Amino acid sequence: MKKAWWKEGVVYQIY
């Protein structure tokens, strides 16, 4: 599962 989202000007990517 891949997820990416934008939070407080920072991009988080969870694999």
UniProtKB/Swiss-Prot annotation:
It catalyses: Hydrolysis of terminal, non-reducing (1->4)-linked alpha-D-glucose residues with release of alpha-D-glucose. It is an enzyme of class 3 (hydrolase). Keywords: Glycosidase, Hydrolase. The keyword Hydrolase applies. Its EC number is 3.2.1.20. One of its GO terms (molecular function) is alpha-1,4-glucosidase activity. It comes from the Bacteria. Belongs to the glycosyl hydrolase 13 family. This is Maltase.
